[in-house]
Amino acid sequence: MAMAMRSTFAARVGAKPAVRGARPASRMSCMAYKVTLKTPSGDKTIECPADTYILDAAEEAGLDLPYSCRAGACSSCAGKVAAGTVDQSDQSFLDDAQMGNGFVLTCVAYPTSDCTIQTHQEEALY
């Protein structure tokens, strides 16, 4: 006697695709912070939700900041925090000493307070 197998697959109704830079629900917050970016062409203050990477918020605000991997695995988007705090636990490039000196990778950094970041700091890392 032959046995028949049947598999069914269904997509969740109303499921939204993952958004790059969106924090998991356990880390989400409704807060938004003022992030001042000190660029070679001048200072620009943007509003950055706590669940959005600083680089993504800057691009949405029309700024053109350097980046390459968008994964925290290189130094193209390096900046230096002059004031405030960020969460960059998604990065894998900077060592403890570099982070202790204020360096941040804007492509994987979330603001955790109002902050000021000097952008275009890749060369200062070395």
UniProtKB/Swiss-Prot annotation:
Q: Where in the cell is it found?
A: Plastid, Chloroplast
Listed A to Z, the keywords are: 2Fe-2S, Chloroplast, Electron transport, Iron, Iron-sulfur, Metal-binding, Plastid, Transit peptide, Transport
Extract the transit peptide range from the record.
Answer: 1-32
Q: Which InterPro entries match?
A: 2Fe-2S_ferredoxin-like_sf, 2Fe-2S_ferredoxin-type, 2Fe2S_fd_BS, Beta-grasp_dom_sf, Fd_pln, Ferredoxin_transit_pept
Ranges of residues in domain 2Fe-2S ferredoxin-type: 33-123
Q: Name one GO molecular function term.
A: metal ion binding
Q: Which cofactor does it need?
A: [2Fe-2S] cluster
Q: Which CDD domains match?
A: fer2
Record's Pfam families?
Answer: 2Fe-2S_Ferredox, Fer2
What does the record note about the cofactor?
Binds 1 [2Fe-2S] cluster.
Q: Which residues bind [2Fe-2S] cluster?
A: 69, 74, 77, 107
Q: Kindly state a single biological-process term from the GO annotations of this entry.
A: electron transport chain
Q: Name one GO cellular component term.
A: chloroplast
The text of the family note is: Belongs to the 2Fe2S plant-type ferredoxin family.
Q: How does it assemble?
A: Forms a complex with heterodimeric ferredoxin-thioredoxin reductase (FTR) and thioredoxin.
Output the PANTHER family linked to this UniProt entry: FERREDOXIN, FERREDOXIN-2, CHLOROPLASTIC
What job does the chain carry out? Ferredoxins are iron-sulfur proteins that transfer electrons in a wide variety of metabolic reactions.
Q: What is this protein called?
A: Ferredoxin, chloroplastic
**Gene source species:** Chlamydomonas reinhardtii
Gene symbol? PETF
